[in-house]
Amino acid sequence: MDRIRRTERLAAMTQMLINAPNRSLALSTFCETFDTAKSSASEDLDIIRTALKRFHLGTLETLPGAAGGVRYRPYVEKEDAFAAVNALCERMSAPGRVLPGALLYIADLVGDPAALERMGEILATEYYDVEPDFVLTMEMQGIPLAMMTARALDVPVVIARRSVKAYEGAAVHITNPVGSSFKTMSLPKRLVKEGQKTVIVDDVLRTGGTLSGMRSLMDEFRVTVAGEAVLIATEEAYQADPDVRPLMVMEGVDAATGAAKIRPGDWLRG
């Protein structure tokens, strides 16, 4: 292989780190990949660490011990998180988004990879210290945000469903109230282990029935729920369940314009 210039090595190392969020990479990995000495690789990582911190692009931590290395986390400062969510609030407050029943149209946001990636990083920042074993969500619209959060945390996504297929094996089923009716929630036994920790991520908090059901489901598995977050919550639901971390809060509907009044979750104010 031709001699690798430092600028090339820095660019490639940065990409390797970004592609493996919250994952430990051994120093030897960089030494072998770029055929460089440990001292040179360490200097490169110091340069990357400084740049990430300066431009608020995340953190690069050194992990001690024989199995240690470095770990990149797409950490989002509170002021940056608030600004990003506030921009989404303005987008969601546009006229024409309020549907019959005071529901908010969010399908385009749920399908926006760039916006959801940032939201996932914001939620992951809140739960890095919790060190969950997986992210739990409910089909269907909660899946994209849960997936992005899990990616930033480097953990699997576990999806509760209204029914399970035969090929998924034995499952735990519960029945819980959702709105004005009762619905079944199911989860294959092989996906979760007793004693694990999870963070619940869903799309909307309106009546609280779905979140309550997922809590009950985790109780059946004896799994600790270490955090709960949603994309958007109604003001009433947020006040009733203040431990939930909503990215956005829908305060109501402007009678004059018919547009939703939406603000960032209070926890984002630092």
Enumerate the predicted regions with their spans.
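Extreme N-terminal segment that seeds HTH/winged-HTH DNA-binding domains in transcriptional regulators
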Residues: 1-26
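N-terminal helix-turn-helix
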Residues: 26-58
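Minor-groove-contacting beta-hairpin "wing" of winged helix-turn-helix DNA-binding domains
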Residues: 58-73
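Active-site-facing substrate-recognition patch
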Residues: 71-131
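Short glycine-rich phosphate-binding loop at a beta-alpha junction
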Residues: 132-139
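Short, glycine/charge-rich flexible loops or terminal/linker lids adjacent to PRPP-binding catalytic cores
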Residues: 155-199
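Acidic, divalent-metal-coordinating active-site segment for phosphoryl/phosphodiester hydrolysis
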Residues: 202-212
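PRPP-dependent phosphoribosyltransferase catalytic core
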Residues: 216-270
